[in-house]
A protein has these predicted regions:
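Charge-dense, helix-prone N-terminal extensions
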Residues: 1-132
């Protein structure tokens, strides 16, 4: 039986993200759904997009972060993460780059929700300052 992909051009990005979360059906889907909720709580004006053949992307005056799923991690890549303060040390991947930073979430990890929302706020503020 052929596995169907949630990606179709006629569906909205939000519906495609819904489908991805459901399709995963494991801790990765639950984690991606939880992160999505936190992003929307932190920035009610966030725009959900679907890029690069199936990557959920959250934007506000530019890309805030992406939500990639792999076998062992959910990776949240912040497009301009290197320019963001991270006093809680959430960034734990892509630390050598000049622009991006990422948070790799493993199955038993707990995300500091308050610190994550602060990162979203900071990413929005940075994008807004660059949009002027």
């Amino acid at each position: 039986m052929k596995k169907t992909s949630p990606a179709t051009k006629s569906e909205s990005p939000s519906k495609l993200i819904d489908a991805r979360i459901k399709e995963l059906g494991d801790w990765r889907g639950k984690t991606l759904g939880h992160v999505r909720t936190l992003i929307k709580q932190a920035d009610p004006d966030v725009v959900e997009t679907w890029k690069w053949r199936g990557v959920p992307v959250w934007e506000h005056d530019g890309i805030l972060c992406t939500g990639e799923t792999y076998k062992a991690i959910v990776k949240l890549t912040f497009a301009k993460g290197a320019a963001l303060d991270d006093p809680s040390k959430l960034f734990n991947a892509s630390l050598d780059g000049n622009v991006r930073r990422a948070i790799d979430i493993h199955e038993d990890d707990t995300l500091n929700e308050t610190a994550f929302k602060k990162l979203i706020h900071a990413a929005v503020a940075l994008n807004k300052s660059k949009a002027r």
